[in-house]
Amino acid sequence: MIVDTSAIVAIVRGATHAEQLAELLVDATAPKMSAATMVEVNAVLARRLRPEDLRRVERLLDEWEIELVPFDTEQAEIASRAYLDFGRGSGHPAALNLGDCYSYALAKVRSEPLLYVGDDFVHTDISAAHRP
């Protein structure tokens, strides 16, 4: 299972289905996240949380044993294509942001479902790890 920024942010902020998402992470076998996605997680949460809360998030990620996967050339090519095909401004209903494309690319490369929140990825060819 690949983990998108939206799932982490939803859990941390206590959004709808946060408990279900957290349970999926606890029960997951070898969850993964792109290293590029981790940058996005930190950027998004740094604007919303105090430093001590950010450290709590880091501990949670460690507890969930999410493997950070280096962002490589293959992922870069897939993410670039995804942005052209599904990105904001493309006219496609997915309207993925750049960070979404990093998660999309890793899910494609690894042929694994993506844990996300929202209605953007549902308009792509990625399989979902969770349906609320």
Say what each PLM segment does.
Residues 20-23, 59-62, 84-90:
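Glycine/charged-rich beta-loop-alpha catalytic/anionic-binding loops adjacent to active sites
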